[in-house]
């Protein structure tokens, strides 16, 4: 299979179950909603070394937010509900409550699983916090130096999927990075997905295990072009750079749509030679996304 002359390898991406919550961050302007959202999703690339996986899902207008102000939807993901509850508490408390004019609402109010995150955060008000109703939602008003912070009492969470992915093989680093950027921009239009790595792009693909017993994962030596003379690089001679796009999503359908949009965008960039995907022969996760099926 080819798209615009780019080979699509007959392989699959391997995803795994993850718990996730959507937070609707609002503020007086889109800029401040984005500032809060960026802080709240920082240090959230992989649960291998971060407290959570997190990213910006998309910007929303006042017609889509509980308080009618500009907003940003973010997704926060953890392997278990207990860790997710802690991540919500700390990320909202340290990154959104502290942001000028920001407020935080649940983006999954109808989810079966609910955390009383807002109630716990309300104690920051030192007894002066007040409970209120807004658009049928229970919220807490916490007094701050710059005005009240509004936070919804409960935040919903669902079973999502992490680890949807594809690999971009390119003639040079510039072409590969441009293709990766184009892919991330296309994925950004797909609701229910995030690309949690820096700018949505992974430069440091990894393999399971290492020569060092204390490491669970190490650099993907087979794809490191500087290791050709060491005899461990398996890349074709015309490939000089590989970038990976990792996608977390609320459903299989969302991840499949994001992969399709991203791959098609990447294949329009000159210098892209092949699209592949990372998997662990079905040993890591229960969700498989065959590239050719996703692109049909």
Question: Where would I find each of the regions flagged by the language model?
Answer:
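Conserved mixed alpha/beta catalytic, RNA-binding, or beta-rich assembly cores of soluble enzyme
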Residues: 2-10, 14, 22-57, 74, ...
